[in-house]
Amino acid sequence: MGKIIGIDLGTTNSCVAVMQGTQPTVIENSEGSRTTPSMVAFTKTGERLVGQAAKRQAVTNPKNTIFSIKRFMGRKYDEVPNEKKLASYDVVNEGGYAKVKIGDKTYSPQEISAMILQKMKQTAEDFLGEKVTEAVITVPAYFNDAQRQATKDAGKIAGLEVKRIINEPTAAALAYGLDKKKENEKVAVFDLGGGTFDISILELGGGVFEVKSTDGDTHLGGDDFDQVIINYLADEFKKQEGIDLRKDAIALQRLKEAAEKAKIELSSRTDTEINLPFITATQEGPKHLVINLTRAKFEAMSAALFDKLFEPCRRAIKNSKFDIKEIDEVVLVGGSTRIPKVQALVKEFFGKEPNKSVNPDEVVAIGAAIQGGVLQGDVTDVLLLDVTPLSLGIETLGGVMTKLIEANTTIPTRKQEIFSTAADNQTSVEVHVLQGERPMASDNKTLGRFHLSDIPPAPRGVPQIEVTFDIDANGILNVSAKDKATGKEQSIKIEASGKLTEAEIEKMKEDAKAHAAEDQKRKEEIELKNSADSLIFSTEKQLTELGDKLPADKKAAIESALEKLKEAHKSGRVDAIKPAMDELSKVWSDAASNLYGQPGAEPQPETNGHAGGSKGGDGAVNAEYEVIDGDDK
């Protein structure tokens, strides 16, 4: 049985971890980093870049570089007007859902997220040396059903069986509390990431991690603080030069990178200089942006964002039934909690110094890996009791939302209620499933609708319709309605906003596999071309050194084969390069057999581009060829 990995699929960065024995390990990616930018780019040649490679070229390719895709997961097009404005790429309306358009192709947010998940999967496979097929993936605690389902679909597309979707602050609490022995510790997890904010109140003790309440804002995170700085820089430059840099995609991407860098610097310094030479040009010549930003100015500009953090905290504490003074620890999670003002406000609100013992960028992935260990049986004596973040119910007479499951109910859970018809002789009912806290159905999120028909005609209020809500451990909902008189039942697995059909998921999985195959093929092609290049170089070098020792016919054959390989290499055609390399290798082999044993003789280059010689020959020859091999590289 393979390992179940833990993935923190973040708005800005993603992270992967796995249990090694009884300890979780964060895995470094191929670039040597423990976190990977949640970015995907498509180059002009059609190559797909993920992670750091995508981030590096974002300034020169803003239209085709996708970032913060998590903000679009499971969302309808009309739900993301602000997110759409902040994207440098095209967000389009396809069937009412937000999708990304690159060239003439559209991608769902699930597909883009799957590309990031594939990168995390590959990172884990490289580390473990084995195939990975199962994962625990984290989501913001305040993600609704549609967003959770979209995350699960992304995992499927990436070739992962998602064993569990768990809430980010809950995962962080698992990582924080795994080795804690204190009984009944009340912990607040304050999780401010790149795109979302969550606050969860938990009680930890005896290996039980019980979430008492959760709240948050899925539209608040580090990106919003970056945007404050972007707007300030753009406004200041407009005052100075009369040019709005927000209308230039490349300039805007440079502003975005500079804003993120400035925000990070202001966490350890009281001021920073933002210097962007050649940001734009006019008829008078190039224009440069040089602006000084103080921490005090940044904090003043971000005041409204800071204020938004604490209303969810008040609600979460109230719903937990704890007094704020009872909270033993406040654990900071998410990169944005490094902002000094956030830390100061958290201390002021909770009346205690926040706990910074966990790495805010890695702790969620570590918690996901621990949950993977629990599911696998490697971690025992840990019980996780999570909650549903939002109330669930159905629309009843008068357009009212009637709640069946209240927010912050421990999951998994099941709830049944009896409803009846609203009119005489009504033979069918529509079950309109809703999620949210507002009293009117129209103000809440529709998760799905289905009909129960063939109800025997009867006066209103007589038929008994039993509605059952069933939430699994992933927080995903199943609803059924049953006519108690006839036993007729209708059910629906909520497949809400942005939910993909099995056929769509299968197609996307095949596309993802094809892309992986294409990437591998491209890599092999590049390696072959590099080998050919190396072989050309070493052949020319040895012709210069050994030319006068070769018989004229052998030398001519080598030169002819060398020219053929050069032409094939120039054409870039793999089907031409390989035979040309084989031919050159063969004629070198023939020539080497004549030369072998002559003073100063050296064997031929090998087809893989590494010079090499016959074993059992002069040891000095072999040593000399090792040096040539090093030069070739």
From Swiss-Prot:
Residues 594-633 are annotated as: Disordered. Belongs to the heat shock protein 70 family. This is Chaperone protein DnaK. Residues 610-619 have a biased composition (Gly residues). Coiled coil: none annotated. The modification Phosphothreonine is found at T196. Acts as a chaperone. InterPro entries: ATPase_NBD, Chaperone_DnaK, Heat_shock_70_CS, HSP70_C_sf, HSP70_peptide-bd_sf, Hsp_70_fam.
